[in-house]
Amino acid sequence: MYPQRTQHQQRLTELLDAIKTEFDYASNEASSFKKVQEDYDSKYQQQAAEMQQIRQTVYDLELAHRKIKEAYEEEILRLKNELDTRDRQMKNGFQQQQQQQQQQQQQQQQQQQQIVAPPAAPPAPPTPVTSLSVIDKSQYIVNPTQRANHVKEIPPFLQDLDIAKANPEFKKQHLEYYVLYNPAFSKDLDIDMVHSLDHSSVVCCVRFSRDGKFIATGCNKTTQVFNVTTGELVAKLIDESSNENKDDNTTASGDLYIRSVCFSPDGKLLATGAEDKLIRIWDLSTKRIIKILRGHEQDIYSLDFFPDGDRLVSGSGDRSVRIWDLRTSQCSLTLSIEDGVTTVAVSPDGKLIAAGSLDRTVRVWDSTTGFLVERLDSGNENGNGHEDSVYSVAFSNNGEQIASGSLDRTVKLWHLEGKSDKKSTCEVTYIGHKDFVLSVCCTPDNEYILSGSKDRGVIFWDQASGNPLLMLQGHRNSVISVAVSLNSKGTEGIFATGSGDCKARIWKWTKK
């Protein structure tokens, strides 16, 4: 009996030894794997540091290049302005010389008449000037040969916006707004306010639905949808979870401004972009969020749906434009540029996307391939591109042109050639605003361009000629956003404005 127990003990000892051997082997192997992993981690960190260094070097080079380019452009602009000033001085000197010669001739003629002619009756008192018939209309009209020029004089009726000083013939005054008309043209357009919509904070954006029945507005933490006809509030959209999630997406001030809103083509969905880097897709029938698109690393400033309704384009301060597939909620294409993106737009046929940025440039890409089709900037052949950040872009209804508004106080109209061997050109530069241009849009008939500015005004421009037809002063603060209803017709239309005075307003224009 005892010998058998001894055999069991020996067997147990052998098994324990085998287990110990296996454990030692596994421990050695684990140590080996750990060492390999540490080597891999070390190499990864080293390569990541090298990549970060390379990226920083590239950013530094881009910054240096941009500064050098800006310095050259500023010097060129200074020289151009100096030449323009010199030309104007020479022209004024020549005109003064001519006037002096004419005065001398008139004095000589009067002296001769006094010698040979009998005394004349005393001169009649001067007739006060109240009509434009004796005013030089050329000061109010853009010279056709200078349509695209970046440097032009502001028409006199836009230089002083004091309604009390305006000619009664060329103004319309209301308790809450007034309109100044260009005296060189007949008052064919009339502007009336339809609704004034109060908000609790600055109105950052306004946008009509495709059928023109509804308008969406974005302000602090809230998106609202109104009936255009009645002005009734039909939806108030607030993401309550944004107040609960105090993570990296929360702004330091606790504010969450809705920077952009856009209806889907069928009007069933509303996309909103905000400071927390998120794009929210709302179902308007339930007033609930059905998708959240994540990927941007900074504030989202602009959104636009594609005509098919399955894709959405976004622009962000993180220097990227992204195209989203709403069927998968994934980003299908990312387009990176040198500076923050402030505005995006999709062409009517969905084939092109345009973006404006802080680097004073409008870029146009093929929406399918991501190929850069056009770069519209101050470096074009004629040197008549924008000279400051571009804050708004809009395609014309036929998709052949792009309007852009900039902090350089101008609006520009670009003709898209769509050919690799021929560059797109700036057709018209619209001069008249006295401060930053923050928003632009085109009427569906391509007859007018509307622009909103920090000078609190909205200007109606004749798209083809570049002439300012009228200025609407309808807010007490900057006009941050302007939008036109797509169902506007040639003789009448609806547009909306959003302002820093915490109001969104719906307006109607009629053409006589």
From Swiss-Prot:
<feature type="repeat" description="WD 3">
    <location>
        <begin position="295"/>
        <end position="334"/>
    </location>
</feature>
<protein>
    <recommendedName>
        <fullName>Transcriptional repressor TUP1</fullName>
    </recommendedName>
</protein>
<dbReference type="InterPro" id="IPR019775">
    <property type="entry name" value="WD40_repeat_CS"/>
</dbReference>
<dbReference type="GO" id="GO:0006974">
    <property type="term" value="P:DNA damage response"/>
</dbReference>
<keyword id="KW-0843">Virulence</keyword>
<dbReference type="GO" id="GO:0006972">
    <property type="term" value="P:hyperosmotic response"/>
</dbReference>
<dbReference type="InterPro" id="IPR013890">
    <property type="entry name" value="Tscrpt_rep_Tup1_N"/>
</dbReference>
<dbReference type="InterPro" id="IPR001632">
    <property type="entry name" value="Gprotein_B"/>
</dbReference>
<dbReference type="GO" id="GO:0045892">
    <property type="term" value="P:negative regulation of DNA-templated transcription"/>
</dbReference>
<dbReference type="GO" id="GO:1990756">
    <property type="term" value="F:ubiquitin-like ligase-substrate adaptor activity"/>
</dbReference>
<keyword id="KW-0805">Transcription regulation</keyword>
<dbReference type="GO" id="GO:0045827">
    <property type="term" value="P:negative regulation of isoprenoid metabolic process"/>
</dbReference>
<dbReference type="GO" id="GO:0044182">
    <property type="term" value="P:filamentous growth of a population of unicellular organisms"/>
</dbReference>
<dbReference type="GO" id="GO:0060258">
    <property type="term" value="P:negative regulation of filamentous growth"/>
</dbReference>
<dbReference type="GO" id="GO:0019005">
    <property type="term" value="C:SCF ubiquitin ligase complex"/>
</dbReference>
<feature type="repeat" description="WD 7">
    <location>
        <begin position="474"/>
        <end position="511"/>
    </location>
</feature>
<feature type="repeat" description="WD 5">
    <location>
        <begin position="385"/>
        <end position="424"/>
    </location>
</feature>
<dbReference type="GO" id="GO:0036033">
    <property type="term" value="F:mediator complex binding"/>
</dbReference>
<feature type="repeat" description="WD 6">
    <location>
        <begin position="432"/>
        <end position="471"/>
    </location>
</feature>
<dbReference type="GO" id="GO:0030682">
    <property type="term" value="P:symbiont-mediated perturbation of host defenses"/>
</dbReference>
<dbReference type="InterPro" id="IPR020472">
    <property type="entry name" value="G-protein_beta_WD-40_rep"/>
</dbReference>
<dbReference type="GO" id="GO:0005634">
    <property type="term" value="C:nucleus"/>
</dbReference>
<dbReference type="GO" id="GO:0017053">
    <property type="term" value="C:transcription repressor complex"/>
</dbReference>
<dbReference type="GO" id="GO:0098609">
    <property type="term" value="P:cell-cell adhesion"/>
</dbReference>
<dbReference type="GO" id="GO:2000879">
    <property type="term" value="P:negative regulation of dipeptide transport"/>
</dbReference>
<dbReference type="GO" id="GO:0009267">
    <property type="term" value="P:cellular response to starvation"/>
</dbReference>
<keyword id="KW-0678">Repressor</keyword>
<keyword id="KW-0677">Repeat</keyword>
<dbReference type="InterPro" id="IPR015943">
    <property type="entry name" value="WD40/YVTN_repeat-like_dom_sf"/>
</dbReference>
<dbReference type="Pfam" id="PF00400">
    <property type="entry name" value="WD40"/>
</dbReference>
<keyword id="KW-0804">Transcription</keyword>
<dbReference type="InterPro" id="IPR001680">
    <property type="entry name" value="WD40_rpt"/>
</dbReference>
<dbReference type="GO" id="GO:0042304">
    <property type="term" value="P:regulation of fatty acid biosynthetic process"/>
</dbReference>
<dbReference type="GO" id="GO:0080025">
    <property type="term" value="F:phosphatidylinositol-3,5-bisphosphate binding"/>
</dbReference>
<dbReference type="GO" id="GO:0036170">
    <property type="term" value="P:filamentous growth of a population of unicellular organisms in response to starvation"/>
</dbReference>
<dbReference type="InterPro" id="IPR036322">
    <property type="entry name" value="WD40_repeat_dom_sf"/>
</dbReference>
<dbReference type="GO" id="GO:0009372">
    <property type="term" value="P:quorum sensing"/>
</dbReference>
<feature type="region of interest" description="Disordered">
    <location>
        <begin position="90"/>
        <end position="130"/>
    </location>
</feature>
<dbReference type="GO" id="GO:0000278">
    <property type="term" value="P:mitotic cell cycle"/>
</dbReference>
<feature type="compositionally biased region" description="Low complexity">
    <location>
        <begin position="95"/>
        <end position="118"/>
    </location>
</feature>
<dbReference type="GO" id="GO:0042826">
    <property type="term" value="F:histone deacetylase binding"/>
</dbReference>
<keyword id="KW-0853">WD repeat</keyword>
